[in-house]
């Protein structure tokens, strides 16, 4: 738990270059550490949020595509989206001046396009920062189709080949940073635009 695997290292930067497996291993170690120190509520553990829990926390009772009550609305927003700029880091405010360079460059080669210190953008109604952009965040669920009927707190399919991550990142355009957007990755996959956020939940 002492090694930071991130490509972009700083005390206030989100972790990146962590797989789903890495994140779950961290959660298990943190749970054991906090339990041993008697700092963990009885019957609770640290884990990743389910996809449903993540979106619920991101939206904070909003119904718009962004959690500031605004939307990603136009084709022009695929480049510059002022509504998203209020709450998240994405590929244009992560280095707008390098747009043409970004189009012609390989993934991860632009120093101006990177993670940013957390807490610089506006939080949502529940005080959560960086739910849009910066790094995408692993969720507990296997990837699968949404349920066809109403379900409370769904947990995804029992098995698949990929896990969900949500929120978009500094490398994504606005449409991929919406509250509802979802993407996937192999459980062992590590990339410089995906990290994770902890959830404290009852042990199941």
Regions found by a protein language model. Give the residues of each.
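Short, conserved catalytic-motif segment at the N-terminal edge
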Residues: 1-11
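Short, structured beta-strand segments at or near domain termini in extracellular proteins/domains
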Residues: 191-204
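Short, P/G- and charge-enriched loop/turn segments at secondary-structure junctions
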Residues: 182-187
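Generic detector of low-complexity/intrinsically disordered segments
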Residues: 3, 32, 50, 200-202
């Amino acid at each position: 738990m002492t090694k930071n695997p991130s490509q972009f290292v700083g005390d206030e930067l989100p972790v990146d270059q962590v797989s789903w497996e890495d994140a779950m291993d961290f959660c298990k170690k943190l749970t054991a550490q906090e339990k041993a120190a008697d700092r963990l509520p009885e019957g609770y553990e640290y884990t990743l949020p389910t996809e449903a829990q993540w979106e619920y926390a991101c939206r904070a009772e909003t119904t718009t595509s962004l959690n500031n009550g605004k939307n990603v609305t136009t084709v022009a927003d695929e480049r510059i989206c002022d509504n998203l700029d209020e709450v998240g880091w994405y590929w244009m405010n992560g280095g707008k001046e390098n747009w043409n360079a970004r189009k012609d460059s390989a993934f991860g080669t632009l120093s101006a396009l990177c993670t940013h210190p957390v807490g610089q953008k506006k939080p949502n109604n529940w005080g959560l920062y960086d739910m849009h952009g910066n790094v995408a965040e692993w969720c507990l669920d296997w990837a699968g189709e949404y349920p066809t009927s109403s379900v409370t707190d769904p947990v995804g399919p029992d098995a698949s080949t990929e896990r969900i991550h949500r929120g978009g990142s500094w490398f994504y355009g606005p449409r991929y940073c919406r509250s509802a957007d979802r993407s996937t990755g192999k459980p062992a996959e590590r990339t410089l635009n995906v990290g994770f956020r902890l959830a404290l939940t009852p042990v199941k």
